[in-house]
A protein has these predicted regions:
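ATP-binding glycine-rich loop module of kinase domains
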Residues: 22, 26, 33-64
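Short beta-strand micro-motifs within the conserved protein kinase catalytic domain, predominantly
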Residues: 78-96
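Catalytic-loop of the protein kinase fold
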Residues: 134-152
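C-terminal single-pass membrane-anchor helix
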Residues: 271-310
């Protein structure tokens, strides 16, 4: 989707009209269809500030962020902590912005490219836990893609970072990317419902676990989910998860919790199989054996904890 040229540019320093907090702009972090995000300093603390062309769009994001932070639980942190909402004047025009916790992390696809595809199931399970909270609050993320998800550097946890596409259940999705859009794949409409997010997540899983060459081959017209199924069938990392992925393609999950349970069961089964193989002394080969397997399981232990506690 094209960028909105009407998005105002933040001045090097500004103060909120109502709350009177002063911000020093350090650099622009990113720009999307309905807003731009800047890294700022406020009283010596780094924050991320988002400003958009339309105040109503910004306020809808604020509403969603406040909603998922109700009863905020450290076990499942869905989104950055909202810190401030205010107005400022830019070139004589009143503009709404919000400041949030700055998350130091790596984009999801870049993290997988650096660490390997063995991490994909663990990260997807984490993401499902976060989507479950969002859906329980009556929202759909909408524009789910690797660019809108980061893995934090401090603890390798998945976080959603761009709420520009969040939409109330039952409405038309406000923002989407065709590559992950259910309608573009001729698999449904753009009605905001949990199944819409789960379809996008399944497509994203296939992309993350595939080579660039294989993924490029799927981007033909017309898009059909049968192409994605072919990739899964021929991919050793994806094949064990074929049932939940295909169910997500066909809208057969009532919610993220159900898909998360299926993914967890598969990971647990593979973990048990690896442990039995190692105990029998039958060798140490296989994609889930070795240092990365251990690291993945340590990360999964944290994922399982809050997954079971929810």
């Amino acid at each position: 989707m094209s960028f909105n040229r009407a998005i105002p540019k933040l001045p090097p320093q500004f103060r909120g009209k109502w709350n009177q907090k002063t911000y020093h702009v350090l650099r622009e972090l990113g720009r999307g269809a309905n807003g731009a995000v800047y890294l700022v300093s406020q009283d010596g603390v780094r924050r991320a500030v988002k400003i958009g062309a339309e105040g109503m769009d910004i306020l809808m994001e604020v509403h969603a962020l406040k909603s998922v932070q109700q009863g905020r639980d450290a076990r499942v942190t869905v989104a950055p902590l909202l810190c401030d909402v205010d107005d400022l004047y830019i070139d004589g025009r009143s503009c709404t912005f919000y400041a949030m916790e700055y998350l130091d992390g790596e984009r999801l696809d870049q993290f997988v490219q650096r660490t390997g595809t063995d991490w994909v199931p663990v990260l997807i399970i984490q993401l499902l836990a976060r989507l479950a909270v969002l859906h329980q609050r009556g929202w759909v993320f909408g524009d789910l893609k690797p660019e809108n998800v980061i893995v934090t550097r401090a603890d390798s946890q998945v976080r959603l970072i761009d709420f520009g596409g969040v939409t109330k259940h039952g409405c038309a999705v406000r923002q989407f990317t065709e590559e992950y859009d259910r309608a573009a794949w001729h698999a449904g409409d753009r009605r905001a419902e949990p199944a819409y997010d789960l379809f996008s997540l399944a497509v994203m899983t296939v992309r993350l676990a595939s080579s660039p060459e294989v993924w490029k081959s799927s981007r033909t017209e017309p898009r059909q989910t049968s192409l994605l199924c072919d990739i899964i069938r021929n991919n050793d990392s994806l094949y064990p998860f074929r049932v939940p992925l295909i169910k997500a393609f066909h809208g057969q999950y009532a919610g993220a919790e159900e898909m998360k349970s299926d993914m967890l069961a598969i990971v647990q089964g593979r973990t048990t199989a690896v442990q039995q193989k190692k105990a029998s002394g039958s060798g140490s080969s296989g994609i889930w054996i070795g240092g990365l397997f251990v690291a993945s399981m340590l990360l999964l232990a944290g994922t399982l904890y809050y997954a079971w506690m929810m």
